[in-house]
Curated annotation (Swiss-Prot):
Gene3D superfamilies: PSTPO5379-like, PSTPO5379-like domain. Pfam families: D-Glu_cyclase. Keywords: Lyase. This is Putative hydro-lyase Daci_4977. Belongs to the D-glutamate cyclase family. SUPFAM superfamilies: PSTPO5379-like (SSF160920). Its EC number is 4.2.1.-. It comes from Delftia acidovorans (strain DSM 14801 / SPH-1). It is an enzyme of class 4 (lyase). Transmembrane segments: none annotated.
């Protein structure tokens, strides 16, 4: 897979339909985002949901109703700048599309949510390997039994991403990722996956499977795929999200998100 270094060039490839893959490892140093697009009539409700669940839904950008632009994150058009989208109807995933131009409506509001792909550069700089990047695959993600804070129709369960590492690396990972609350921050769990309702660590709900090597433990971070579970629970007539792993690459630098 080709790797790009600057988000403007990368998004041009996406807009032109030349890149449709997962975005882990693309444009090191720049923030990636999850996406949820909802009708205006439920946007305030979803905003309350995000504020109730900041670990899973750290907002980094919100559009004006009807606009697909997020100027604070760069020269971005949400209709065309992600490699793959999922369309939900009545709470169920109905289709996958690569462009939203024909689906866009004047009442839609876009929410960009920080993604843990953004702190992976800092992990690697600190000597913590990120195996899904090294192996060229997507991070495994799991639906847990951790209930989200309920806001009106929006609830569901938390989704987590998993990265395998040694116990010593996990300690370092906690130190590093605690600096980045805008992209999920510190892990929510490490060790026994059954304690958060994950029955089989080698069968993720999203992403790609990744077996633990001897001496490794699973480390779990809250994930921006969580809003998709909230959309399912709300049974909205219409909503759009990114396909898990296929993120919006912004022009916001990760270093600007560090809390300390």
């Amino acid at each position: 897979m080709t790797h790009w270094t600057h988000p403007t060039e990368f998004r041009q490839e996406v807009r032109a339909g030349r890149f449709r893959g997962q975005t882990a490892g693309q444009c090191p140093g720049y923030t990636q985002g999850n996406l949820a697009i909802l009708p205006r009539e439920c946007s305030e409700e979803f905003l309350r949901f995000a504020r109730l669940n900041p670990k899973s839904c750290p907002l980094i950008g919100v559009t004006e109703p009807g606009s697909s632009r997020v100027p604070e994150l760069g020269d971005i058009d949400l209709k065309t700048d992600l490699p793959s989208y999922w369309v939900f109807r009545d709470g169920h995933r109905a289709e996958q599309v690569n462009d939203l131009t024909d689906l866009w409506r004047d009442d839609l509001v876009g929410f960009v949510i920080g993604c843990s792909y953004s702190f992976e550069d800092a992990l690697r700089d600190a000597g913590v390997p990120v195996r899904h990047i090294d192996e060229g695959r997507g991070a495994p993600m799991f639906i847990t039994d951790i209930a989200n804070g309920q806001a009106g129709r929006f609830g569901g369960r938390m989704v987590v991403s998993m990265r395998p590492m040694t116990a010593a690396q996990a300690i370092r990972a906690i130190q590093v990722t605690s600096r980045f609350p805008s992209v999920h921050g510190a892990p929510v769990h490490l060790g026994d996956p059954a304690q958060i309702g994950i029955a089989d660590i080698e069968r993720p709900d999203f992403g790609e499977p990744m077996a633990l090597k001897p001496g490794e433990i699973p480390v779990f971070w809250a994930c921006g795929v969580t809003p998709q579970q909230a959309i399912r629970s709300a049974a909205l007539p219409f909503a759009i999200t990114h396909e898990p792993g296929h993120m919006l690459v912004t022009e916001l630098r990760n270093s600007h998100l560090a809390a300390f």
